[in-house]
């Protein structure tokens, strides 16, 4: 899996993005990159290897100044691991940047059509098609361009997008690949998973399928793929950020194995009241619960209980 982190606000974006990407290393990757708007143009840095390579290249983000940006850790699907194939990808003018998780299934015919229109491709990726499609449809209205592109592509995606002439906004979109957004007093965030931004905010919104999000400093607007605005309710994350870290263990499998007693206790304890088990979310009586004959467990983890 790949990882996405985006930020727009009052703080320097690059260190925040690097920190967020470090919290997504468990997803696996072979390269990493960032795009940062410096007040005049979008600058990119990309590198094959561990995130540390990108951190060293950018001096921990200190030599990429700007308060808005998007970052990505890539696990190669279309195209070998290389600096060129790493994200972000740009349009030919360098005014639109895109990071993408997922697979664009119809990228080959789309790429041919864009090449016929004169667009120059520099990578082997399916993602670069998105940058050129956005360029083709962009007439000053980012939401319109994004939704037109989403109507044309087939497959799965989670996207982070920047336009150089929209310095106070970044955008996100999703279909079948996980994506969240969040906000704080100092800015707004995009992430593939909660741990990436939990250090900065506990107020998050889960982006649903075929939704587009416009992010500004401290504000979020949600739209359907048909450009209809959507009202969404935030979720407050109340679990400990340390649960997402390796906490000194060599790897996550060891951490999960040794944390089983605590995990069982943390799961069961809130459900015990007055020597009885209470699961209010089920909205079922004791008699109805006793009639249950089968329990199906679905889990996404190295282990499950």
Regions found by a protein language model. Give the residues of each.
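Conserved short alpha-helical segments that host acidic/polar catalytic motifs at enzyme active sites
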Residues: 1-255, 259-299
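Conserved small/polar residues in nucleotide/adenosyl-binding loops
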Residues: 303-305
């Amino acid at each position: 899996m790949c990882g996405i982190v985006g930020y727009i606000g009052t703080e320097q974006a690059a260190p925040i993005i690097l920190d967020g990407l470090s919290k997504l290393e468990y997803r696996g990757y072979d390269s990493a990159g960032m795009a940062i708007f410096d007040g005049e143009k979008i600058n990119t840095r990309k590198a094959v290897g561990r995130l540390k390579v990108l951190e060293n290249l950018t001096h921990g983000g200190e030599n990429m100044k700007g308060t808005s940006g998007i970052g990505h850790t890539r696990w190669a699907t279309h195209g070998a691991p290389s600096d060129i194939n790493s994200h972000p990808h740009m349009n030919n003018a360098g005014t639109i940047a895109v990071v993408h998780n997922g697979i664009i299934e119809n990228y080959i015919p789309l790429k041919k059509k864009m090449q016929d229109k004169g667009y120059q491709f520099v990578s082997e990726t399916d993602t670069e098609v998105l940058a050129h499609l956005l360029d083709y449809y962009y007439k000053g209205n980012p939401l319109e361009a994004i939704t037109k592109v989403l109507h044309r592509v087939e497959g799965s995606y989670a996207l982070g997008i920047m336009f150089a002439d929209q310095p106070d906004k970044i955008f996100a979109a999703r279909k079948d690949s996980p994506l969240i957004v969040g906000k704080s007093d100092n800015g707004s965030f995009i992430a593939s998973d909660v741990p990436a931004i939990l250090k900065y905010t506990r107020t998050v919104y889960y982006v649903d399928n075929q939704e587009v999000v416009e992010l500004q400093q401290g504000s979020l607007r949600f739209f359907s793929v048909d450009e209809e605005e959507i009202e969404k309710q935030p979720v407050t994350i109340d679990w400990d950020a340390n649960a997402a870290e390796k906490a000194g263990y060599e790897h996550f499998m060891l951490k999960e194995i040794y944390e089983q007693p605590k995990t069982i206790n943390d799961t069961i304890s809130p459900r015990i009241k007055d020597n009885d088990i209470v699961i209010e979310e089920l909205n079922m009586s004791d008699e109805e619960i006793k009639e249950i004959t089968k329990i199906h467990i679905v889990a996404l983890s190295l282990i499950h209980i």
